[in-house]
Amino acid sequence: MNDLISYVKKTLGACECGTVHHPLTVEKIAIGDNAVEQELPAFVKSASYKKAAVIYDETTGRLAGKRIASLLEETAETVPVLLEANEAGDVTADEQTLVSALIGVPIDADVLIAAGAGTIHDIVRFCAYQRGIPFISVPTAPSVDGFTSAGAPLILKGKKQTVQTTAPIALFADLELLCQAPQNMVAAGFGDMLGKVTSLADWEISRLLAGEPYCPAASRLTREALDQCLDRKDDIAAKMRDGIEKLMESLILSGLVMLVLDHSRPASGGEHHLSHYLEMKALENNKRQVLHGAKVGCSAIMLTDIYRSLIGASLGDQHAEQAIRSVYEKLPDGKKMAEWMRRIGGPVSFKELDVEEELVREALAYAHQLRDRYTGLKIINQYGLLPGLLGKGPGVKGVKM
């Protein structure tokens, strides 16, 4: 995976699945030691950008934002845009923050630079889309797979919604900086990738039972990204250079696949719906946010056991029962996934995240309504299996939260 852009173009360009594949608009990806220092100024100069708004929060400003401004001193004028935290201490991609960021970007800026992790990138990609100018990605932690995608999960009127905006024109990932990321941020990135276990199964189920568009090549690329993380989990856990490089490559590859498809289907299923629901509830109650990848990882660990427990369930629909067996019997069990996540230093249950059991039950009942997607999460509600899962009625076995 030395040249991710060419690899994705070649693999998906040869695909004959019949679904729409969009052009890959990311021009450059640089992952390596001193990638920002050595390659960002040259890229800005070659593109003839004159005025860059560098967007960051208090923490990422110290880590990268101010350094970027210094690096570009002789190349372009830079304007800092500091994102403020809310009362709970989080920077969130809600209306207030989005408008504040847009106001902070000078009208004559011709490029934006996102210096941060997932939320900052979502805010910047929205601003770039609204202003009609490109943005450059400078990740400060290997924590999410959305760096190179066009989808921006935003909080609009208190509800989590993914808005298709724009992908970065380029990404520069400094391995020295990424290796210094806190362990919980690294574990969050691994958790976001672990979510592909259930999201890929959900995509296949939706193909079989709901006739949703499906691309085998995109599924295969996402699976490769997941497998690469699993193969290097010990190196990732130790934050070794090669391990962090492979984690970052995997996150970027997943994002590029989403970009070409113009949707997040291979990377986001029931586990993301649960995560988004819990995030919305935290905002409602003015609570500090839990890292996205931590919630996704815990959701995937729980859902894989739920999905496996559906095998053999009597649904009164032979086709659905056969599809469930063919897809879900290939899933690893939650105990094995928890071992992987624990090795990286991440949480394996919602109890560890201080999420109340009753809220998890509520999420299992309602999170599938957030997106019009067919998932195993929707199946358990469609066929009335949730009470049995929660030990409150007949049906499949209970599940550990």
Swiss-Prot record:
Which positions in this protein are listed as binding Ni(2+)? Answer: 192, 272, 292
Where is NAD(+) bound in this sequence?
A: 57, 118-122, 140-143, 149
The UniProt record lists the EC number as: 1.1.1.261
**Which GO terms of type biological process are on file?**
glycerophospholipid metabolic process; phospholipid biosynthetic process
The protein's predominant localisation is cytoplasm
Q: Where does it live in the cell?
A: Cytoplasm
* Signal sequence segment: none
Its needed co-factors are:
Ni(2+)
- One GO molecular-function entry: metal ion binding
Q: So what does this thing catalyse?
A: sn-glycerol 1-phosphate + NAD(+) = dihydroxyacetone phosphate + NADH + H(+); sn-glycerol 1-phosphate + NADP(+) = dihydroxyacetone phosphate + NADPH + H(+)
UniProt superkingdom? Bacteria
Q: Where does substrate bind?
A: 145, 192, 276
Q: Which residues form a coiled coil?
A: none
Q: Kindly report, in one word, the top-level EC class recorded for this enzyme.
A: oxidoreductase
S-S pairs: none
Q: Which UniProt keywords apply?
A: Cytoplasm, Lipid biosynthesis, Lipid metabolism, Metal-binding, NAD, NADP, Nickel, Oxidoreductase, Phospholipid biosynthesis, Phospholipid metabolism
- Among the entry's GO cellular component annotations, what is one? cytoplasm
Give the cofactor note text: Binds 1 nickel ion per subunit.
- Give the HAMAP family listed for this entry: G1P_dehydrogenase_B (MF_00497_B)
Listed under subunit, the entry gives:
Homodimer.
Role summary: Catalyzes the NAD(P)H-dependent reduction of dihydroxyacetonephosphate (DHAP or glycerone phosphate) to glycerol 1-phosphate (G1P). The G1P thus generated is probably used for the synthesis of phosphoglycerolipids in Gram-positive bacterial species.
| Similarity-based family | Belongs to the glycerol-1-phosphate dehydrogenase family.
Name under which the protein is recorded: Glycerol-1-phosphate dehydrogenase [NAD(P)+]
Species, as recorded: Bacillus licheniformis (strain ATCC 14580 / DSM 13 / JCM 2505 / CCUG 7422 / NBRC 12200 / NCIMB 9375 / NCTC 10341 / NRRL NRS-1264 / Gibson 46)
What are the leading ranks of the lineage? Bacteria, Bacillati, Bacillota, Bacilli, Bacillales
